[in-house]
Amino acid sequence: MQLFKLKTRLSEFDSFADFAKEFTKEDLIITNEFLYNPYMRGLNLPCRFIMQEQYGMGEPSDEMINHILADIQLENYTRVIAVGGGTVIDISKLFTLRGIVNATDAFERKIPIEKARQLVILPTTCGTG
């Protein structure tokens, strides 16, 4: 059974500023502070930023994901943008699902695996994505 299908498109930009030109208030960016401070902070982008390390370190856990979900549950976003390594990307993939309010519900398939948001990934380490 095929749960979902990814349609990949590769793009190239000269800088993060060029990449971010089309970001809107409906974008949710999940990243790390060590990337945000030098590359994103000065751009004054209208989107919501989540700094993954503020919710825990290491591999993503149900607890980490649920804390982030609790902070953004009332926000409307149409696109999830992951800028970072494996943890950031894994969390971002989950946040594209329709109706997700609890990580365990998604992992146990208590909610339909239905994509509701576009996913954009900017991997920052080799082997991620």
Model feature map: region roles:
Residues 1-79:
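ATP/NTP phosphate-donor binding region
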Residues 60-129:
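Glycine/threonine-rich beta-strand-loop-alpha-helix active-site module
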